[in-house]
Design a protein with these regions (language model features):
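Phosphate/diphosphate-binding glycine-rich loops and adjacent basic-rich segments that engage nucleotide
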Residues: 97-108, 112-116, 124
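Active/ligand-binding-proximal structured segments within catalytic/core domains
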Residues: 15, 124-136, 144-147
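Short, charged, surface-exposed secondary-structure boundary motifs
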Residues: 92-96
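Charge-rich, well-structured scaffold segments of protease-associated domains
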Residues: 1-86, 91, 102, 112, ...
Length: 282
């Protein structure tokens, strides 16, 4: 239960539950103390046998090893890997809309997440939402949320936007850590930024800089062998293909200003947004 001592992490789990109330995507990955204690050794072994199977696996490698040697090692160490794959039926999740929840806790700082339904990882606008998220509240210091709320107004200890996209669903959100006295103002300023993205087209220069910055971040990420290895494996697992960096550049370059605004109008609908707050006890 130690993770409950970190409200800035716990709020993300509870926000998932708020938007996916009747679906496994809304369940806490760690489970509960009761559920974990209920597992037997045999249950865990059988679960691994049914789900961690060769048919579901991808082996990814980056570094000073040629492909034939990698295949030889894989065959040597994984040739006896067996399993009885479970066939899971998946129900497309319903994303709840307009949910408002305020929770009082024994904390000093306040926390807020605003968000709603996004798009799936297979959606034609997936590259667009990656750029939109990066522009709005990505890791760079010049993101809109960081500049206008944390730097200009000084009312957020931390602020960021995020997207969680799955095979058939997705959500977006904005997290901010602030004080009880400034949480309402922080909320208003976040809504203001979303409204601007909905109602006002990006300038040509701003859009060009956003593309360049996103591609620069992707290029830097590829300098890490671990990041590249993980990215290649995930791409093959999800899409059954691996895009070269040149192909990624082509996708980003093909984005249009109108496409970004239309996407913002689609997902940043004010009457469909949900909100979760953690605030200190009175």
């Amino acid at each position: 239960d130690s993770y409950r001592d970190s409200p800035s992490e716990l709020i993300f789990d509870e926000f998932d539950s708020l938007l996916y109330p009747d679906h496994p995507l809304g369940r806490n990955i760690l489970g509960s103390e009761k559920s974990v204690k209920s597992f037997s050794k045999e249950q865990v072994i059988n679960f691994v046998k049914r789900n961690y199977t060769p048919e579901r696996a991808v082996l990814s490698s980056v570094g000073g090893i040629n492909h034939s040697e990698f295949e030889r090692l894989a065959d040597r160490h994984a040739s006896n890997w067996k399993g009885e794959m479970d066939i899971h039926s998946r129900t497309t999740p319903f994303v709840s809309k307009s949910k408002i929840k305020h929770v009082k806790k024994e904390i000093h700082q306040s926390h807020i997440i605003i968000g709603g339904e996004g798009i799936s990882i297979h959606d034609k606008d997936y590259t667009a939402i990656v750029l939109l998220n990066n522009l709005l509240g990505g890791p760079s210091m010049n993101s809109r949320l960081n500049l206008n709320i944390r730097e200009r107004h000084g009312i957020a200890y931390q602020i960021e936007s995020f997207i969680n996209s799955y095979n058939d669903s997705g959500i977006w959100g904005i997290y901010a850590g602030t004080d009880l006295e400034t949480i309402d103002r922080c909320h208003r300023l976040i809504i203001k930024e979303l409204t601007l993205l909905r109602d006002k087209k990006l300038g040509i220069l701003q859009f060009s800089k956003a593309k360049t910055q996103l591609l620069g971040q992707m290029a830097l990420a590829q300098e890490s062998n671990v990041n590249m290895m993980t990215s290649l494996g995930k791409s093959l697992l999800v899409y059954n293909r691996v895009d070269t960096f040149k192909e990624i550049v082509t996708k980003v370059d093909a984005l249009k200003i109108s496409q970004i605004q239309e996407l913002a109008q689609q997902i940043f609908s004010s009457h469909e947004m949900s909100e979760l707050r953690y605030v200190p006890l009175d």
